[in-house]
Swiss-Prot record:
UniProt site positions, description: Transition state stabilizer: H18
Assigned protein family: Belongs to the bacterial CoaD family.
One Pfam family matching this protein: CTP_transf_like
Name listed for the protein in its UniProt record: Phosphopantetheine adenylyltransferase
Record-listed substrate binding positions: S10, K42, T79, R93
Organism: Rhodopseudomonas palustris (strain ATCC BAA-98 / CGA009)
GO biological process: coenzyme A biosynthetic process
Location of this chain's protein in the cell: Cytoplasm
Predominant cellular place of this UniProt entry's protein: cytoplasm
Biological role: Reversibly transfers an adenylyl group from ATP to 4'-phosphopantetheine, yielding dephospho-CoA (dPCoA) and pyrophosphate.
Metabolic or biological pathway: Cofactor biosynthesis; coenzyme A biosynthesis; CoA from (R)-pantothenate: step 4/5
Subunit structure: Homohexamer.
Amino acid sequence: MSRIALYPGSFDPVTNGHLDVVRHAVALCDKLVVAIGIHPGKKPLFTTEERLAMVERVFGPVAKAAGCDFGCTTYDNLTVTAAEKVGATLMIRGLRDGSDLDYEMQIAGMNETMAPAIHTVFLPASVGVRPITATLVRQIAAMGGDVSAFVPAEVASALKSKFAAGSPA
């Protein structure tokens, strides 16, 4: 039986912090499925299709190099429902600091009640990526700042193009 892990998030955009989590997660499972949450009330900077393409291009080679199968999907329901749908028994969550832990522990407890067969695995962020958040990356990019230290090169390029084209600031 293969061990399938789900790594959920908005990935708007993919950051080096997300990449750090994936690098660690692929060592824990036979297949990693990255699930992009679609929330009707939120207006993402990147379209669903753009985020799926980013996830595939950035994370896919990392999984392949580790000998881990890889997939990406979207979901618009409960995260545990998305995990069950792909057959995941592990849910991967990255932690930057104590406030992340407090929040994620609450969610993990609720998820465990709803889906006891799915276990949350917390992966602490490596020191160099702890301060990175997608929100801060978007803000820096919107103001014309250099985000190349915080995101993969192709994501930095996509952000530059988004804001140069007069897209949402």
